[in-house]
Amino acid sequence: MSGSSRRLLWAATCLAVLCVSAAQPNITTLAPNVTEVPTTTTKVVPTTQMPTVLPETCASFNSCVSCVNATFTNNITCFWLHCQEANKTYCANEPLSNCSQVNRTDLCSVIPPTTPVPTNSTAKPTTRPSSPTPTPSVVTSAGTTNTTLTPTSQPERKSTFDAASFIGGIVLVLGVQAVIFFLYKFCKSKERNYHTL
């Protein structure tokens, strides 16, 4: 075997290893944060929470304390509203006439809203793994009331077999091997000695 054939064989082997390693599924995927939202029945439907970026509007605040404190920290005026007719509590830029408003943190209640907030999530429902309950942490800041926050644990994601990816990986590897084979044959044909008559 000549020097160029060895290099070509070595390059083909490295390319095949690279293709096989790239075709393997990514095992270290992170599961999204999942919280359970109670419905009118006893069935629990999990929803995916998106990570929050720095809030710029009042609608992005989901608690009374963060809504009222936005006036001081983000230089925007927000009101925490309790609407009895719609049975909703939320943060808004301006008060509504049929809702009572809260503009001080000492008036904020720790009771969560009774109606679940609808989301536009397309995530499949996942089951929470059996794990010990995390200990709640108490967050306290000057001039506010104590609120107990329970951290949500991330459920493990079950990996499933994806037939389309498997077939695509096989086609990719066979295609790369065919290209390598024809390149090898082409280079081998160039190495022959041609004799003139």
Swiss-Prot record:
> In the record, which residues are listed under signal peptide?
1-23
What family is this protein classified in? Belongs to the CD164 family.
Q: Where is the composition biased (Low complexity)?
A: 121-152
Which organism encodes this protein? Answer: Mus musculus
Query: According to the UniProt topology, which residue ranges lie Extracellular?
Result: 24-162
GO terms classed as biological process: cell adhesion; heterophilic cell-cell adhesion via plasma membrane cell adhesion molecules; muscle organ development
Q: Its encoding gene is what?
A: Cd164
Name of the protein described by the UniProt record: Sialomucin core protein 24
For this chain, the Swiss-Prot or TrEMBL PTM comment says: Highly N- and O-glycosylated; contains sialic acid.
